[in-house]
Amino acid sequence: AQIGRLLAFLEERGMTDNTMIVLLSDNGASREGGPQGVMDEWSFFNSEWENVDEIVANRLDYIGTKKAHSNYPWGWSQVGNTPSRWYKSQTYGGGIRDSLIIKWPKEIADPGAVRTQFCHISDIAATVYESLGIEQPKTLNGHEQMAMHGESLRYTFGGPVQGNKRGPQYFEMMGHRAIWSEGYKAVTFHDQNVPYENDTWGLY
């Protein structure tokens, strides 16, 4: 509803055509519900699984209220992340691959079209900077700033293009690691009780 209010505001003021709107989802479906779902998500983090029969008998109506911090079971997480593998907090596609929508009628040649180039969250700021025609500031309030790692997505705005201009991208989340380069992705699941050098990698 709030997105609709924003779009209506821009339309009323004739600002729609020259406004870039970026809509990005958060992450993949979570795994904190465990194999059978939980009424209190902290039970997952504390490895204290709740009794499903007790939940159904006594606490089912708590879902959606302040008395619950519920989460769905792994089966629904897998459905939500299909066709990608695994869950939120992991570096497989099920955890980190999300939808990105960019609307800018004045600059995007074919609205509604789908792009398949790889992009990363760090590319959004670089895209905004290039679109505004400005450079990243070297300092802010007297403090030196780190260089951005993202690449602008402007090259995709003019229509479908061949290839991908982006260089390698490394990911890490809670010890799980992955690296993407030229359409290939190497990824590993890290068990916190196992040395990193013993992790098994897969190539996709």
Language-model features: where?
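Short, glycine/acidic-rich hinge or "gate" loops at secondary-structure transitions
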Residues: 14-22, 139-146
